[in-house]
Amino acid sequence: MSPVTTESPATVPYVEHIGMTRQYWRDIILGINDGLVSMLLLVAGVVGGGLDADQVLLTGVAGAIAGAVSMAAGEYLATKSQDEVLTAELDLERTHIIHYRELEVAQIREMLTAMGVRADELEVVANALTRDDEILLNAMKALEFGVVDSERRSPYKAMVMSGLLFLGGSLSSVLPFVFVDDTTIGLLWAGGITAIGLFGVGMVKAVVTRSNHFVSGSENLLIAGLGGVVAWWVGKMIGVGLT
């Protein structure tokens, strides 16, 4: 009788997590996309208004700086406010654990059951998570509020990323007017570079999300581009109404 052989299943290659940047990808995508789209619309508007290349360049530089500062300040305040709300909620949760411990223990049992912990395992798991107030607080922080300390966003990092990436995105619409005197040619260059930039941002996102590069790039280009077209059209309609 020949020996029975078993083939081991194909090994899935181990892929590292992206690390501490993952909670800031919102700021990365928003900052650079906003810089790409909003600055192109600004440049298109002033070119349509008849400004020469030097005036367009000056307007673009001023708009890029103002937009970056506004984006950075807004993101700092928004992130800090969200973190303050969360801190206040966790302080209240600590008070609940001290004064209404039985209710919190019952709540964590309900959450464990909802997660699929079997009845015969529930007592062991619940006792492990409730044997100490600090352990219970950490468990409630993760299960009730969905918070892990390592994933909390720094307002300063969010501010810097949003502001700098907005500034970086705006360069695609500003730099062409450093090298050309014809505003129409400059605008065409700005539009082309912006489109490439939007597609590139989507492709970079696909590397992180491990999704299809072309689909992600096209999605970012189409959605951001459509938003830009809508904004331009609304502005044009308002302008027609005023004249």
PLM feature spans:
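Cytosol/matrix-facing amphipathic helices and coiled-coil assembly/linker segments
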Residues: 2-20, 24-26, 80-163
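Small-residue-rich segments of transmembrane alpha-helices in multi-pass membrane proteins
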Residues: 219-232
